[in-house]
A protein has these predicted regions:
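Core catalytic lobe of class I
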Residues: 1-217
Length: 217
C-alpha cells in the first residue's frame, strides 16, 4: 500500500489516484465518468485531522448534513446514469464528556470507532446522551435531494472498538447505504450470491454483512 503524504495526481500504468480534498478534486472530473463510488466520509465530530475547513467538525449535525448534500451533488454529476454509490457512515452521541478518543491500541491498528461521544452541543432537539442518528440524517437528506435510497446494509463488527459504557449496549455495527441517481442501474446480483443449503445456485445477497475490522497494511 502506498501512503500519499501530499495532495496530487499519481499514476501507474492504467491506474490513477487523485489525492486531495473531494471538494477540490471532484470538479476536475468529467461528468458521467464514474461507474461506482465507494466512500466513507469523515464521521461527524469524532476525529480532528488537523485540516482547516475539514468535513466532520461542523458545529451542528445540520451543517454536516448540508456539507454532505453539497458534496454528493458533485458526486451525482460525475456518476454515470447507471452508476451506484456505496456510502458508509458511523454515528455519534451528544455528550458532556467531550470528544471521545479511540483506545491507542485500536487507533494504531487502524480500527474504526463505532458510535462515540461527541462534545455536547446546544441544540433545540438533541438532549445529553442522545444518539444523533447521523447516518440516517444524511441518507434522508440525499433522498430528498433526488438520490434513490435503494438499500440500507448493516455492517456487523464481531470485534468492535471497546466502549466504557454501562447504560447502553456497546456499538457493534455501522451503516452502508446503496444510492443511485436513476431508477435503472448496473447491479450484478449473480456475482454476489451467497451460499444456501437449499439451493445450489445460492441466494440473493442479504443486508447484514459480518466483517471484522482489520489493521491498515
Amino acid at each position: 500500500m502506498v501512503r500519499l503524504a501530499h495532495a496530487g495526481l499519481y499514476t501507474q500504468g492504467a491506474d490513477m489516484i487523485h489525492h486531495g480534498d473531494v471538494r477540490t478534486i471532484l470538479p476536475t472530473l468529467k461528468a458521467g465518468s464514474v461507474q461506482c463510488v465507494v466512500t466513507s466520509p469523515p464521521y461527524w465530530g469524532l476525529r480532528d485531522y488537523g485540516v482547516t475547513g475539514q468535513i466532520g467538525l461542523e458545529p451542528t449535525p445540520e451543517a454536516y448534513v448540508e456539507n454532505m448534500v453539497q458534496v454528493f451533488r458533485e458526486v451525482k454529476r460525475v456518476l454515470r446514469d447507471d452508476g451506484t454509490v456505496w456510502l458508509n457512515l458511523g454515528d455519534s452521541y451528544n455528550s458532556t464528556s467531550g470528544f471521545s478518543r479511540a483506545n491507542k491500541q485500536w487507533a494504531r491498528k487502524g480500527r474504526d470507532g463505532g458510535a462515540n461521544d461527541k462534545k455536547e452541543i446546544k441544540h433545540p432537539t438533541l438532549k445529553t446522551k442522545d444518539l444523533i442518528g447521523i447516518p440516517w440524517r444524511v441518507a434522508f437528506a440525499l433522498q430528498a435531494d433526488g438520490w434513490y435510497l435503494r438499500s440500507d446494509i448493516v455492517w456487523h463488527k464481531p470485534n468492535p472498538m471497546p466502549e466504557s459504557v454501562t447504560d447502553r449496549p456497546t456499538k457493534s455495527h455501522e451503516y452502508l447505504f446503496l444510492l443511485t441517481k436513476s431508477v435503472q442501474y448496473y447491479y450484478d446480483a449473480e456475482a454476489v450470491r451467497e451460499p444456501a443449503q437449499d439451493s445450489k445456485s445460492g441466494r440473493n445477497l442479504r443486508s447484514v454483512w459480518t466483517i471484522n475490522p482489520k489493521p491498515y497494511a
